[in-house]
Amino acid sequence: MDDGRALTVSRYRHHGQTPHIFGTLSTRSGKVVNLSEKEVSITPMQVTSLSNGRRLPLQWIINAPEHKINLTTRIIKSDMWLPFVIPYWEGPILASGSNEAWGFMQLTGY
């Protein structure tokens, strides 16, 4: 993020179950804070239809209130689907809100 911190958030889901969310927040000094699902949330906002017909949540809101983080992500390019044995979407993202940020997103299981 533009303040020198780095945020990583993972959201694992299984059909019919509540997603498991966790993350880490690294400070400029190198301190790493583990974030539980009580401390960080990630919510899908916009579903995008790809040229192959797949529909994916490619815009998300990420909140970590205790750390004053509230971000909305946006993708740079939508058609980044990789049809491997385990197909997935991956690509660079930007985020704005409490900070300006840039990063990477990977989605599987869609």
Predicted regions: what they are:
Residues 1-110:
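Structured soluble/peripheral alpha/beta segments that form catalytic or ligand/cofactor-binding pockets
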